[in-house]
Amino acid sequence: MKVSTIESGEISKGASSPRKGMKRGLSIMDFILRIFAAMSTLGSALSMGTAKQTMPFATRFVRFKVSFHDLPTFLFFVTANSIVCGYLALSLVLSFFHIVRTISVKSRILLVFLDTVMFGLLTSGASAAAAIVYVAHYGNPSANWFPFCQQYNSFCGRISGSLVGSFIAVVIFMILILMSGISISKSKH
């Protein structure tokens, strides 16, 4: 029966196994969260992009209708959510690569950098749209902007719902960035 001893400077193979298992778990969670964020941004873009309503009455020359493309802020919101959804779909490949190969660090650094850029884009689009939705619901009496959600309640319901999905994706991005930072820091030690 042979007894093997570990000399100083050697690392046993069993010591890296828990760390590798934790990194694999983080990578699997990263993959799942990216899928949820992609679905959330896609739902938000579709909900806002199809939001329109026509008033049931019309005058002889004027027909009262509202659509998302009437406001440039909503166009930016749809564009930002679409770009982020496309990025998330493409980043699933890299996220799956991290499940298979847990020791890759450079690709994780690239992913955390791009995640941060997309987080900023998504946050700016969602925040700008939230400001317009607030004015649509409550108006601004000092600027003489009247709320119009009482007349266009279906439209306002859709745009408010699309904000929920977008802000869920913002929270998921915060979690993804933190998890990537943890994964990168664990690989340096």
From Swiss-Prot:
It is found in: Cell membrane. Residues 1-21 are annotated as: Disordered. One of its GO terms (cellular component) is plasma membrane. Its main location: membrane. Residues 47-73, 130-163 are extracellular. The chain crosses the membrane at residues 26-46, 74-94, 109-129, 164-184. It comes from the Eukaryota. It is a multi-pass membrane protein. Residues 1-25, 95-108, 185-189 are cytoplasmic. Keywords: Cell membrane, Cell wall biogenesis/degradation, Membrane, Transmembrane, Transmembrane helix. GO terms for biological process: cell wall modification; cell-cell junction assembly. PANTHER family: CASP-LIKE PROTEIN, CASP-LIKE PROTEIN 1U1. NCBIfam families: A_tha_TIGR01569. Regulates membrane-cell wall junctions and localized cell wall deposition. Required for establishment of the Casparian strip membrane domain (CSD) and the subsequent formation of Casparian strips, a cell wall modification of the root endodermis that determines an apoplastic barrier between the intraorganismal apoplasm and the extraorganismal apoplasm and prevents lateral diffusion. Belongs to the Casparian strip membrane proteins (CASP) family. Homodimer and heterodimers. This is Casparian strip membrane protein 2. It comes from Medicago truncatula (Barrel medic).
